[in-house]
C-alpha cells in the first residue's frame, strides 16, 4: 500500500514530462499498471473475479 504522501504527489503535475509514471488508483502500486483501467494487475484480478469491472471476463482457450 502506498503512503498517502506518494498518492498526493502522484496527482500533482511533474516538473518534467519524463518524470510522470502511472500508479494504481486503488492501492498506489507503481509497477504493472494497466493504463486502460488505471489499476495494477493484482487489483484488476481481484475486481475482475468479483465482477465489478463491466466487460471484463476471464479468458479460456
Swiss-Prot record:
Which GO BP terms, alphabetically? translation
Which residue windows does the record flag with biased composition (Basic residues)?
1-14
Cofactor, free-text remark: Binds 1 zinc ion per subunit.
InterPro entries, alphabetized: Ribosomal_uS14 (IPR001209), Ribosomal_uS14_bact (IPR023053), Ribosomal_uS14_sf (IPR043140)
Which residues take part in binding Zn(2+)?
A: 24, 27, 40, 43
| A Pfam short name | Ribosomal_S14
Molecular function per GO: rRNA binding; structural constituent of ribosome; zinc ion binding
Per UniProt, the keywords (alphabetical) are: Metal-binding, Ribonucleoprotein, Ribosomal protein, RNA-binding, rRNA-binding, Zinc
The source's superkingdom equals: Bacteria
* This protein's GO CC annotations: small ribosomal subunit
Q: Keyword Manganese: yes or no? A: no
**Residue ranges of region Disordered?**
1-20
Q: Which family does it belong to?
A: Belongs to the universal ribosomal protein uS14 family. Zinc-binding uS14 subfamily.
Q: What does this protein do?
A: Binds 16S rRNA, required for the assembly of 30S particles and may also be responsible for determining the conformation of the 16S rRNA at the A site.
Describe its assembly.
Answer: Part of the 30S ribosomal subunit. Contacts proteins S3 and S10.
Under which name does UniProt file this protein?
Small ribosomal subunit protein uS14
Q: Which organism is it from?
A: Lactobacillus delbrueckii subsp. bulgaricus (strain ATCC 11842 / DSM 20081 / BCRC 10696 / JCM 1002 / NBRC 13953 / NCIMB 11778 / NCTC 12712 / WDCM 00102 / Lb 14)
Q: Which gene encodes it?
A: rpsZ
